[in-house]
């Protein structure tokens, strides 16, 4: 590790193989917490390269517990987090709305590190069982249209890193990796990223896979469609922008999509919205993100996806998906 750290301190970059090997060594407990912390810190002070990101990703996918859900043509709706915006759990809510619209969802998530309440925090609070048992996860998709993949159950190699990330409480390159290391290898992916540079890197890496992808970045910094301004969209076949008026809705202010100050508050906001009791801003931002997931899988237009998402939310289909998952978790 000393050699690697000296290399990084000298403003050199790692090759793909070096990046992969470092992460494998971290996972096998070869480095102490101080060394791991120093390594993570370097990448907070400069941009990660494509080779480094690719090497880290390969290591995590090699070490993870894989789950085969290929029979379902699933999508994962996942943001990198680390955008510092502290919104409510938009992508998790959008996942249930998409499931209510008939899309099969394999939601990869974790506890919040740089945010108050990550996807797993709110799912746990809602009584959702975390499991890596294939038959349970298949039953969830069969009956609820969605399963929850709690990252630590599938990436046990990262147990050495979890406490350090929590103590640092800022975004690290693991935020960038999260959406790319779904252990079920979904055929479709809706990814939100916290800056344009990362959006380009993701696009480059996904172009070399068979994944049908949509990458999102709101130009004012959100890792999802925020409706607070235009959102950059990159897919395997196009690149463009989408604005609130494209969905026929108004521009939102940042305060309208803020999350709770505690996990309890976050769960309360989640329950209100999925039950159809959210306010206009909350409903619109959830449906806009669900719309992009629906459009990614079905190839309908985002506008058509938005109508399908609204129907799922307001008819209670999204809520039914959540209730079924809660029932299966008992």
From Swiss-Prot:
This is Anthranilate phosphoribosyltransferase. One of its GO terms (cellular component) is cytosol. Transmembrane segments: none annotated. Pfam families: Glycos_trans_3N, Glycos_transf_3. Mg(2+) 2 binds at residues 223-224. Its cofactor is Mg(2+). One of its GO terms (molecular function) is magnesium ion binding. Gene3D superfamilies: Nucleoside phosphorylase/phosphoribosyltransferase catalytic domain, Transferase, Pyrimidine Nucleoside Phosphorylase, Chain C. Belongs to the anthranilate phosphoribosyltransferase family. It catalyses: N-(5-phospho-beta-D-ribosyl)anthranilate + diphosphate = 5-phospho-alpha-D-ribose 1-diphosphate + anthranilate. Pathway: Amino-acid biosynthesis; L-tryptophan biosynthesis; L-tryptophan from chorismate: step 2/5. Keywords: Amino-acid biosynthesis, Aromatic amino acid biosynthesis, Glycosyltransferase, Magnesium, Metal-binding, Transferase, Tryptophan biosynthesis. Binds 2 magnesium ions per monomer. Anthranilate 1 binds at residues 79, 110. The gene is trpD. Anthranilate 2 binds at residue 165.
